[in-house]
Amino acid sequence: MGVYLSTPKTEKLSEDGENDKLKFGLSSMQGWRATMEDAHSALLDIDNDTSFFGVFDGHGGRVVAKFCAKYLHREVLRSEAYSAGDLGNAAHKAFFRMDEMMRGQRGWRELQALGDKINQISGMIEGLIWSPRGSDSNDQHDDWAFEEGPHSDFAGPTCGSTACVAIVRNSQLVVANAGDSRCVISRNGQAYNLSRDHKPELEAERERILKAGGYIQMGRVNGTINLSRAIGDIEFKQNKFLSPDKQMLTANPDINTVELCDDDDFLVLACDGIWDCMSSQQLVDFIHEHINTESSLSAVCERVLDRCLAPSTLGGEGCDNMTMILVQFKKPISQNKNVSPAEQSAADKQPTGDTHWSEIHVTEESSS
């Protein structure tokens, strides 16, 4: 089977949800691709005050994206930093934890189980939402103990995935990103990027890649992968003299924190199958055009997917898997400003970054 199908799979997996602070809609579609390698998480209430959303764009295979969709939010919850109110640090640790968990006999077994489940059912299962209601994903008692077995020396998967997640607690928004999936917020109709696309040609990324012994060819690390950060891809993380954040390819996420206000309209998380076809502002404008006329937020997402789908595979753009989550904030947001002293202290410790989204007040935790 080639990279593309003869006709696109346009069936969509969509869902909507709502609580007293926000509502969301999402949709995913395989499109022209021969396999569906996107995955996502949408959890309205991982605790009484906190929602979690994530998109994961797999490459070289699909199991790492599925693994992240199933386990990343669990590791956020399990973190001591999370208990202390430091959502950014909790997310930061969880990204690295994904690589650790996918090693050894236990990691091999979990990846095999996800792969078997995927292979036995149609490709649309790739968009499955892992939630406390639909799986055991809220079980925090598994300490991921070491297992003996024939795959005890398994170093990790050769395939990988981007990860872009948004954690909303009251009026605090924390975005963690590794790769080229993207998170965008609409404030008074203006699009602001809350993540940066990690590409090898970026100066800081290029410097790290070269120092780790890698090279860049045709915009790809070692001529292979067109991302500079991702979860998985163990073959690019083999320098034993370097820490995980210094490897030529790293899971190290950018962490950005935003104080939400009543000017904030909605939040979008999407894989590059969307961003290759529309700029951040174009997508925000498109959503504003349809959000008040469609019956649900997922219907808006479906419109976006249809808008991006190419009529043929000749042009390249519009031929990728597509996944999008749309989160709309309920007003007034100001009434949600119930931040504990521990949470405020954690946020205050994050330095303000000099970034391309600086017109909106963002605190950025350095990941270089």
Curated annotation (Swiss-Prot):
Q: What EC number(s) does its UniProt record assign?
A: 3.1.3.16
Per its record, the protein catalyses: O-phospho-L-seryl-[protein] + H2O = L-seryl-[protein] + phosphate; O-phospho-L-threonyl-[protein] + H2O = L-threonyl-[protein] + phosphate
- Residues annotated as binding Mn(2+) 1: D57, G58
InterPro entries cross-referenced by the UniProt entry: PP2C, PP2C_BS, PPM-type-like_dom_sf, PPM-type_phosphatase-like_dom
Cite the entry's keywords alphabetically: Hydrolase, Magnesium, Manganese, Metal-binding, Protein phosphatase
N-terminal signal peptide: none
Q: Which residues bind Mn(2+) 2?
A: D57, D272, D320
State the Pfam families in the record: PP2C
Q: Name one GO molecular function term.
A: protein serine/threonine phosphatase activity
GO BP field: signal transduction
Entry keyword annotation includes Hydrolase: yes
SMART domains in alphabetical order: PP2C_SIG, PP2Cc
UniProt region (Disordered), positions on chain = 336-368
The record's remark on the cofactor is: Binds 2 magnesium or manganese ions per subunit.
> Which cofactors are reported in the record for this sequence?
Mg(2+); Mn(2+)
**UniProt domain PPM-type phosphatase: residue ranges:** 23-329
**Gene3D superfamilies linked to this entry:** PPM-type phosphatase domain
Quote the biased-composition stretches of kind Basic and acidic residues, using this chain's numbering: 356-368
Similarity section: Belongs to the PP2C family.
Q: What is this protein called?
A: Probable protein phosphatase 2C 58
Q: Which organism is it from?
A: Oryza sativa subsp. japonica
